[in-house]
Amino acid sequence: MEEIRVSPDYNWFRSTVPLKRIIVDDDDSKVWSLYDAGPKSIRCPIIFLPPVSGTAEVFFQQVLALSGWGYRVISLQYPVYWDLLEFCDGFRKLLDHLQLDKVHLFGASLGGFLAQKFAEVTYKSPRVHSLVLCNSFSDTSIFNQTWTANSFWLMPSFMLKKIVLGNFAKGPVDPKMADAIDFMVDRLESLNQSELASRLTLNCQNSYVEPHKIKDIAVTIMDVFDQSALSQEAKEEMYKLYPNARRAHLKTGGNFPYLCRSAEVNLYIQIHLRQFHGTRYAAISPEMVSAEELEVQRTHLSNNSESEDES
């Protein structure tokens, strides 16, 4: 089954949103690939960061829907970085190149971990205004592979793919989830050995998020109630780390809800971003927001500032 690859939505996405390639490092082999849709006048867009197996295409349903509603959306895939600080430095340079001062980040699995680490590393000069963390984690030790992290670069491609596929859902799943898995397997096949090895290294290198550095960032935690690669323990850890986070629970969706439950995921992203309407950190064009919604947002903001003044 290759339903997603031949779907009208995916073909429309591929034919209307150009893929850009950007180099920001001295090393010309480090190329960021990204799709940038929606109004370029928006200076605080939402940026999507994929999981180990993903490419920039895996968020095509979010790119199409959100840009259609007036949001600026960037979906990207990483160059080969072997170290978290190296990744954070490269991502900061990319934001500088795109002339983006602050951004909202949606990260899936590894993408969510990298989003948190980037927010943490840049906390003294903040670049992240908010986070949506989908099926994500805060400590790489949950994978029990920190001891192998330094040997991924030696492994052949087929072994690395086997490691990743081991986390995909097994057993019966509904047709949409089956299509999502097929599409992700196809995306996994498109990654070369160094791309996969470097992502697995970042995913398993001994590291954890320091929450006190990013405590002022608005967070939504999005997870699924059915089978995913994340243990219940890892989910509970995220809730503890971000006690004030909004929670977006999906009954089903597996590892890739942004593909197989895109309508629900898009709605939760909208709800998350709505709190910034009418501010300089809005990810949406002001003309696309109804006057009524802006008024509600202004009232909400003024109430918040009043309650802060009282406290």
UniProtKB/Swiss-Prot annotation:
It comes from Danio rerio. Its main location: cytoplasm. One of its GO terms (cellular component) is cytosol. Transmembrane segments: none annotated. GO terms for molecular function: CD4 receptor binding. The gene is spg21. Residues 86-159 form the AB hydrolase-1 domain. Keywords: Cytoplasm. It is found in: Cytoplasm. InterPro entries: AB_hydrolase_1, AB_hydrolase_fold, Maspardin. This is Maspardin. Gene3D superfamilies: alpha/beta hydrolase.
